Structure formats: structure tokens, C-alpha cells
């Protein structure tokens, strides 16, 4: 199944507007998933499809040093020694098994379980969602919230709970999403984080890019997803892409949303500088030759 492209985004400002929910450039997956900003992507002629479990990409960004520093927080991604910083290009090896690399401290985990201005799970609207989730998964839930199955259940539940995928919203709070049952990937991730935290599961929102391979090609989209601390690791949960589980996907993080207070929109501007303007999928041999 292929994405239907509505309009392509080619500027950093477009990435900011998609985070804010403004109508600039979007695509839709089927009829049951939210919209995403399309990022220009090309594939070198000597790269064959389907893609392997690891890909090598050149990523043009506004602030390559900052973008590279963010990637150090994950396993399954590595920067090539051959960097074109003067052209704002990062050469990256990216695995489809990307996951957070840094083990959080007790204080960090406490922060990712907190009720905040954006992830406001103590609000009545979100508590209603929590009750609905527990009613549906009570037999599986038990008293073990640390199992990755809970993350899968949260993903499935939020994917079905948001019944009107749409890009007409600004970046909404969890309680707003709980009431509207509408939104794009940011709304999916905010509500999923709220549900997890209400269950005492540390959860965070990641902003970045997802590269998706479907039957006829490869495309890249500005995106937001979750990571939840389950089974002693950061486990990815992506309710917005739940219906695309059969497709091969590569996640390229740009920002961990840490400021969930009143100044959250200022914090999101950090993601702008790390978001790709252009992605080129290259062969492994090209990058090895460049490193040598």
C-alpha cells in the first residue's frame, strides 16, 4: 500500500509547521492513519530494493553537529568518518532496530512518569481513556506494567482510539486529544505517552524522521513517536504507524521532547535545526571507500 502525496515540503520552516500542525505539506497512509510531511529522498542507482536491515544515508541538515550529537543517544545508528560538514551533510549508517542507548537515572525515569502541561494524564478526559484501556486489556495487564507487551497494547489501543486522523490541529495536549480523538503523529504520541505514564510507565516523545519502504519505492516523512522504558530498555511505540507494521521502517531521531511545560513550543524549535532537508540512500561500498 502506498502513501498518497498531497504536497511536498522542502524547507526547514515546513518542518516547524508540521510540528505545530499547520497546513503546509502532508501525505496520508491509507484512510486510518495521520498525515506526515514528505521529506525529499533519492536513492543511488547502485542501491537495490528491498532494503537490507541496515542502510547508509547522506542527510542534509541545518545544524549537523547538533544533529549528530542527538544521534549518540541511540543504538543502531552510526556516523561515518566521512562527513561533509561544510555542506551540512551527515553520512549515517541506520538500522531498522534503532533503540535508545543510554540507561536513564532514577530522576530521569521519574521525569518521564510525571504529569505535565503537555502530558496531562491526571485530567479527567485522559483518565477516561485509561479506564477504557484497562477495561479492554485487564486480563493481560495484571500487575506487570514493565513488559513490552504493554507497549504493544498501548500502541494498538491508541491507534484505534484516535478515530479521525487529521493535520488540522496545532500541537495538542493529551487531554485535548483524548476529547477530540483526532490528530496527526504528534497527537498519537502525546496521548500514548499520557496513557503510559498513567500506568506508571516512563514514556517520552521523540521527534524526527521515518523512512518507509513500500512495494514501489522508499519515502521519508517528518514524524513523532514514543519510547517507553519497558523490560529495562527504551522500547519504541508508534501508534500513528501501527497499520504500517508490515512495512520496513527506519527511524532517524532529531529531538527528545524534554520541555513539556508552558515553553514546550520553544523546545520544539530545537528539532527544526536537526530535521533533514534532503536524504540520499547510498551504497555501503560508497561510504567505506569514502572513509578510506
What spans do the regions from the language model cover?
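Cysteine-centered nucleophilic/redox motifs
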Residues: 150, 154-156, 182-209, 226
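Active-site rim recognition segments
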Residues: 211-292
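Intrinsically disordered, low-complexity N-terminal segments that are enriched in acidic
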Residues: 30-101
